[in-house]
């Protein structure tokens, strides 16, 4: 899913009077960090819901998890769920290939989200490299954590 889930929550929150930036959403997520629920980001219910926020809450409800109430809780559920998805995917790749990987390269728009990159590092136990790619330009940054 990538940042699809986060982008949809941001779109829902934005009104004529207020447009939330990603740093503002990250701040909300940080305030709610520690909220325990995790969703399967690849579940079909997140492909094109009328409300991503409601889809996250309903998934938590139907799987017997704590239901996020605040937008910060919804955001941290998504961040933790994306990081869990990275962890699961890396484990699957390691099992299929018979290799152990020591690092993950995050490319595209998501690499700019250091909160997500920190979550990926925490969940996977791997080094995370954030790489911005535009045409032939590649900038690699190892997280200073």
Can you say where each PLM-predicted feature lies in the sequence?
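Active-site core segments that coordinate phosphate-bearing ligands/cofactors
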Residues: 1-104, 112-145
């Amino acid at each position: 899913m990538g940042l699809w889930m986060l982008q949809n929550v941001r779109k829902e929150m934005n009104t004529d009077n207020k447009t939330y930036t990603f740093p503002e959403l990250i701040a909300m997520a940080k305030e709610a960090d520690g909220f325990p629920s995790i969703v399967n980001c690849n579940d079909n219910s997140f492909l094109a819901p009328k409300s991503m926020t409601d889809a996250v809450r309903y998934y938590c409800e139907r799987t017997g998890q704590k239901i996020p109430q605040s937008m910060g809780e919804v955001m941290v559920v998504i961040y933790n769920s994306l990081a869990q998805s990275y962890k699961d995917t890396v484990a699957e790749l390691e099992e299929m290939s018979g290799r152990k990987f020591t690092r993950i390269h995050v490319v595209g728009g998501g690499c700019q989200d250091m909160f997500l990159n920190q979550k990926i590092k925490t969940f996977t136990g791997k080094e995370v490299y954030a790489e911005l790619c535009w045409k032939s330009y590649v900038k690699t940054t190892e997280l200073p954590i």
